[in-house]
Amino acid sequence: CVQAMCDLYGVTHIVNTGVAGSLDAQIDIADLVVSTDALYYDVDVTPWGYEPGQLPGMDCLAFPADPALRVAIEHAAALAAPDVRVFAGRVVSGDQFSASSQAKERLAQEFGGMCCEMEGAAIAHACHVNGVPFAVVRAISDKADGSAEMTDPEFETSSAMRCAAVVEELCRAGL
């Protein structure tokens, strides 16, 4: 999707919203995390000299989010959802739902993740390759430790509405 948006529409920024599991004890369900960067946690080509999570041929381990866009999102969140706590940190992405406290600990310790999900690093990767500033915004849906039940539809709706309100506020600000 990001590549198509870059190729066909000449986008100037990408803001991706969704849900994630918290990897930090201070971050609770319904809090927001805005990316400082994004990293794949399921890439391992360490036998060839790469860092865990690093893609061969890439000039970085993690894909840095745009700092000005992150600040604008934090400001928009304060206006659109003043009751929601907002954290800035690393978003780690992989092909598995984090289902144990051991996996959670590994993602936090080895990769420095603040939250984990399944698509933010791919979006960040495409933005990085295309030189498009980006930020990933995640509403926390669970504690990423195996305690999560099926996501509550009411929570999904409220998370989507909260993220949409933040994006609307960004648009009002001219981004």
Model-derived regions: residue spans:
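Short acidic/His/Gly/Ser-rich catalytic and metal-binding motifs that mark active-site loops
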Residues: 43-44, 98-101, 143-147
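Zn-dependent metallopeptidase/amidohydrolase metal-coordination segment
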Residues: 121-154
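Active-site rim beta-loop-alpha module in soluble metabolic enzymes
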Residues: 48-115, 130
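Short glycine-aspartate micro-motif
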Residues: 12-16, 115-117, 134
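Short, well-ordered amphipathic alpha-helical segments that serve as non-catalytic structural scaffolds
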Residues: 1, 5, 71-76, 159-170
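Metabolite-binding pocket within alpha/beta catalytic cores that recognizes anionic/polar moieties
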Residues: 1-71
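His/Asp/Glu-rich mid-to-C-terminal helical/loop segments that flank catalytic regions of hydrolases
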Residues: 144-175
